[in-house]
Amino acid sequence: MVKLAFPRELRLLTPSHFTFVFQQPQRAGTPQITILGRLNELGHPRIGLTVAKKHVKRAHERNRIKRLARESFRLHQHTLPSMDFVVLVKKGVADLDNRALTEALEKLWRRHCRQAPAS
């Protein structure tokens, strides 16, 4: 049976983890969200989230966006390639409802799966 947990090892935790992804990213994006990815050697995907106060003013909106991104990643973790992902949020994302945001994230996960080199 497939576990759908979200343990600590599935998260990017340190600035060096984020820097690693920013150096040579593979990009997939919409006007409101960009997901950067870079292959890792761990055998499983990891995610890091950046939701700037500059783009989403209210804390409860930032928390909602991060919660939906984490949940989307958690549900797709077994179909994703072994990559480190950073979810970047742009202006206008707070205007999306939960369904539209979830659909956008799913579309971006599928795009990363197609772009990933076969392993």
Curated annotation (Swiss-Prot):
Enzyme class, spelled out: hydrolase
GO molecular function annotations of the record: 3'-tRNA processing endoribonuclease activity; ribonuclease P activity; tRNA binding
Sequence similarity: Belongs to the RnpA family.
Keyword tRNA processing assigned: yes
EC number: 3.1.26.5
Protein name: Ribonuclease P protein component
NCBIfam families: rnpA
GO biological process, one term: tRNA 5'-leader removal
Subunit structure: Consists of a catalytic RNA component (M1 or rnpB) and a protein subunit.
SUPFAM superfamilies: Ribosomal protein S5 domain 2-like (SSF54211)
Entry keywords, A to Z: Endonuclease, Hydrolase, Nuclease, RNA-binding, tRNA processing
InterPro entries, A to Z: Ribosomal_Su5_D2-typ_SF, Ribsml_uS5_D2-typ_fold_subgr, RNase_P, RNase_P_CS
Reaction catalysed by this enzyme: Endonucleolytic cleavage of RNA, removing 5'-extranucleotides from tRNA precursor
Function: RNaseP catalyzes the removal of the 5'-leader sequence from pre-tRNA to produce the mature 5'-terminus. It can also cleave other RNA substrates such as 4.5S RNA. The protein component plays an auxiliary but essential role in vivo by binding to the 5'-leader sequence and broadening the substrate specificity of the ribozyme.
GO cellular component: ribonuclease P complex
